[in-house]
Amino acid sequence: LTKKLFAACAVAGLILCLAGSTLAYDKITEGEPGEKIERSLAVDPQAVVTLCVASGTLKVRGWEKSEIRVRSLDAVQIDFRRIDRTKDTSKPATRVDVMLIEKGTASHPRHDCQALANVEMEVPAGAIVQAQTRDGDIFIAGVAGAYAGSQNGDITIERVAKLVEAGSVGGSITLRDSSGRVNLNSAGGGVEVFNVQPATEDDTFEVGTVSGDIQLNRVSTPNVNAKTVSGTLMMSGPLAKSGNYGFTSMSGDMVLVMPSDASFKLNAKVSERHSIVSDFQLKFLNEPAAPPTPPAKKAPEAKSTKPIDKEKDKTPKAGPIVAPIVIGRPAVVAPYALRRITAVCGSGDATISVASFGGTVRLKKI
């Protein structure tokens, strides 16, 4: 599971890589030291805009104009690179990379995400934004799509209409008031989500962390998949009709808070040492205590060593041969380390699949 989560973070990073190599530089705008420089460019209302720096805070907002405007106090030059490969450069750009040259490096400019600068940018509300920084926070609001990646900073995304993908290694991720397909991954930080709904019936919601907590509040997407290694996983809000929810945790607790009239089918795999605590009246469809019985029958194999007690005095070398038996016992017990529970609440409209290997699962009423 850990490898999968790190792989997911790596995938999110790859998505943010700058694409294309065809250069179409517009004229250069330079600023004096201490002066905030600003630059604009006409673009298609649904343009794809990429902004990337090595370090710095990035703030991106959508507006009603069909142009992008970039401002920075830390850069002396802002450069727009068209990568739409159009033959007619008089038409508004459909794909643009925003490049910055920081103060002190004008004589030896560093392109391709090497600038150290804080940046503010406005883009058309229908645009898709790709923002990336190694050390810094990212804020994106009011656009059609958002791809965001930060190694050590926090990511905040609001009011996105169609899709969101965000990944952070050491920072937290917050998503509010958005719709569409969602994929969020953080290795060391937590993930908080508020008011997210699908834009189409095929939209999915996926979130994963390694050590950070996951909090999902009022997520109405019908297909939800949340995974964490050691964080606490919490979901609060009504279930989508005929929704499918998957929750996996290695060592953290799970808390699912739902309305009192929630209707769902529960498919759970939980550790024998932990339990499911429910405020809801559950109708169990199988007997959870049955699986642990086979190990009790397997234990008498130890009797086979008693007749050999007389042999032990003659052959003390037999001791090491017993060791593999100790190793072999977990192989018999392992299949029953998790209890499989199937239960129904109400008419079972939604499906909740839970896998908890070391924490308690709580089903609470709002």
Positions of PLM-derived features:
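Intrinsically disordered, low-complexity terminal regions
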Residues: L1-I366
